[in-house]
Amino acid sequence: MIENITDEIYYHINTGQKLQIGDILEIGKRFNNFYYEIYNIEHIEDNKDANQYLIDMKKEKNLLLNNDTLNLVFKTINDSAMITRELMFEEVRKELNPNLPSRLKCLYVCKTKNEIKDWINIFSRTNKKDFQIVKLKLTGNIFTGDASFILRQNISLNRKKKQAKMYWNGEKKDNINEYLFIGTAVVEDILN
């Protein structure tokens, strides 16, 4: 479930502030970039959110969406589902084992370069294009979960909670490994 590691090499896809060789990161005390981004996201266009656009369209019986409005609605639905998922997973983590690394404060890492390629593929679907691949030396605690439990977002809260329990209990479904790290990370190399 949770493993204590010392000076082990892992890789990270960094989408935040650019890192340099020798940087030392203390992970686990504050929100990570992923959670900070989704927690602070707002989708508003012309002082309207997606719900207001949909309400107006229904009132006017005009169900045609222009591309900008469609993108706004899509991003709102997707991000709302993601936030709901993360909050559910955090609630379940606290219930089952609060000593496991929080998805909200951890550093997501990969064990191999092949796993990095798989995650870059997943990232490409979210339009994250500006990133660094960094090689890290890690000392701390690491949890291995199966990310296939988190990839489907628009499911019932009940099903989401069941998936969260399976994830935090270390069950395997499709073996899409996801490593959650808290502790000290030293940047050994920048690979791109």
Language-model segment annotations:
Residues D79, L96-N97:
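Hydrophobic alpha-helical segments, principally membrane-spanning helices and signal/leader peptides
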